[in-house]
């Protein structure tokens, strides 16, 4: 199986999204866990709300194939690591391997360190690194819950380097993806405040009333569709499957046309 990433814009998706996603690398383990693959088969029956089970927070590594405007663009990897106690880390790396992105050598990395407080994911720090032939930028942010502010340093605009007042439940882009995985239920509306790189945005999502059969490459998933409702002409759609710790597909559309499309091709426990 392979994995593929979108371009810079995907880093601001909640799993966006994605996306997300931007996604990360991990030190190799002595014995890698077995890869989980779902064999293709006949369409799976839709699940009622009572049968839906959101995936628990657990360590994993996932590989995505990414398309940009319908053309293969590169690779994306996402990893969640338990660093001890209530603290976790989520990483994403996107590498451009096709077309213009390959020529420029685009390499995007994001990470968020967070802890779990009464079931809520609270970001502690966040970093974004963008590399390329004519590009090299890094920004690091700290979410200080004692002072109630978040602030970024590095390659950020002056007006985005000021402290931002925090509110309970505030999320980074990568953390928002995990929160959607935790909170999504058939028919449920979800509301989050996104705070990252000196910006604050409201993100509202709606889950479909029931699951649907989704084909991702050679695999078939019984997945719940979750979509953003306040993005205007920028649509973000995720499909979440029972038993899979990460979205099986993330699609971003602009003005009715597909822009970034991430398709899960492999995942494994860490």
Segment roles from a protein language model:
Residues 19-24:
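N-terminal signal peptide c-region/cleavage motif recognized by signal peptidases
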Residues 132-173:
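Hydrophobic, well-structured mid-protein blocks that either form specific transmembrane helices
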Residues 26-145, 182-270:
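Acidic, serine/threonine-rich low-complexity disordered tracts
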Residues 2-12:
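Bacterial N-terminal signal peptides that target proteins for export
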Residues 160-196:
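Short, structured interface segments that constitute the first stable element of a domain
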Residues 10, 150-151, 248, 252:
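Short, hydrophobic/proline-enriched secondary-structure or compact coil segments at domain edges
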